[in-house]
């Protein structure tokens, strides 16, 4: 979205970035090795008997236990495709998701941010505490990100995680629509 807003400013009236995966500036100067994360994501279970089996597997597991149950149900219902052999597989295969992590630092958004004049609202969850183990639920968003936009507003949501749209869809939808 940041790339589109910078390239096509007349096409976007405002931006709402929901706990965006925009790393601190220095991360793009010295890209980290995400191979461990990519490898872990790439090994995620891909085969399921069906949406009910997937729901039962995830409903009590972190981070899915944080999600609104109706959202988790929709994820399980609509996030699977028939595998052609009577079972189901993830619509976004684990290797495809892993490639997102592997290439996440290939485009530095920071030079683009200074060219965005539209109002930008950043919805942000808590970052991982120093010394804690990596958790996909923690925010990758720098607390000062909104300040870097010409017209930026930071909305810190300490009771939510990186999965905020799945945790509290009504609240996030209202913030997107009404600011």
Predicted regions and their residues:
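Conserved hydrolase catalytic core segment
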Residues: 1-30
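The alpha/beta-hydrolase serine catalytic core
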Residues: 32-65
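Hydrophobic, aromatic-rich cap/lid helix
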Residues: 69-111, 127
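Conserved loop-alpha-helix segment in the C-terminal half of the alpha/beta-hydrolase fold
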Residues: 115-160
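Catalytic histidine-centered segment of alpha/beta-hydrolase-like enzymes
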Residues: 156-170
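Short, amphipathic alpha-helical "lid/cap" segments that border enzyme active or binding sites
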Residues: 169-177
């Amino acid at each position: 979205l940041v790339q589109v807003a910078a390239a096509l400013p007349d096409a976007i009236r405002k931006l709402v970035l929901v706990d965006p995966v925009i790393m601190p500036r220095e991360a793009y100067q010295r890209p980290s090795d995400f191979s461990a994360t990519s490898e872990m994501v790439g090994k995620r279970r891909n085969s399921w008997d069906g949406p009910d089996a997937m729901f039962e597997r995830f409903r009590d597991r972190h981070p899915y236990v944080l999600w609104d149950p109706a959202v988790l149900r929709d994820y399980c219902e609509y996030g699977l495709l028939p595998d052609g052999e009577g079972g189901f597989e993830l619509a976004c295969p684990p290797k495809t998701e892993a490639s997102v992590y592997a290439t996440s630092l290939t485009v530095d958004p920071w030079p683009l941010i200074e060219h965005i004049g539209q109002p930008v609202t950043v919805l942000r969850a808590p970052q991982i505490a120093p010394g804690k183990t990596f958790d996909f639920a923690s925010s990758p968003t720098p607390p000062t990100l909104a300040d870097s936009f010409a017209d930026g507003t930071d909305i810190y949501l300490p009771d939510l995680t990186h999965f905020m749209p799945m945790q509290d869809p009504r609240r996030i939808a209202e913030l997107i629509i009404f600011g």
